[in-house]
Amino acid sequence: MKELKKPERIYIEDFDIYVKPRLLDAEIQKICNNVIKFKTWAEREKTINLMTFIYATEIADKEDEINALNYDLMSECGVFEKIKETVVNSGDVYKAVAFSESTLLALSQIADNLPEMLEPIKEVLKRHGRLTEE
């Protein structure tokens, strides 16, 4: 295999910024974990836009730059749309959110935890009711 090199950042001349061509899976997961905390579309979209911008421009450790962002202006000017167009896997954030909120995942998690969830019920039935064990 050929030696792998870190991909070069892409310059977006319209906004004078450089962005990574791809988000890392861990970054997508962090965005997803924050998005699912919110219930309204606007809060979710703002979280996706800002966090994608922060990770794509690699300013995650620069709190002063993050605090200086003017979300509404950036949104009106199309900064977030341009970044999503440039970062090839930005759409994976929406897939991650859909997966995290899927019924199949919820059922799988319930099934995994069902024995633990039933223990208190078994104890109550043993003390106060009738429990048939097979």
State what each model feature region is.
Residues D25-E134:
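Short, surface-exposed, charged amphipathic helix/loop patches that serve as local interaction elements
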